[in-house]
């Protein structure tokens, strides 16, 4: 069984950069703030569906202090001259009436300098592996239609994808049944 709270894996990005994908920890708060401050307005808009400049203490605590039962959060890190730096993050939050829950909402963010290197896809695969073991059968996401990069991550995931457009959003359903192609 996967120990999500202590999850850690090494990956190589498309450009050859080595990264660590690991469970987020409460002590990641400052590094997460730095990563969020490194996002441009468009990325913040796509991730949070509006202009977002500041994050409340409650939002930061919710982002870094997760239960690893219903909420799983992973960060992608590199080593730089000052130590570990967060360059991406992803999470899912389980919902639904089943016990244990079998549906989850999934979301990601990646620093601009690292877009297009496959980080979100790698986080998605790691989250999916944990989710499947916990009985999650579908990921759901709401994506702004202009966020072509995120839609491409889902479409290239290897999992069956269903897209529905309504109320100005793309509603994505990703079936985790079976293995990704």
Where are each of the predicted segments found?
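Long, contiguous binding/interaction regions
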Residues: 1-181
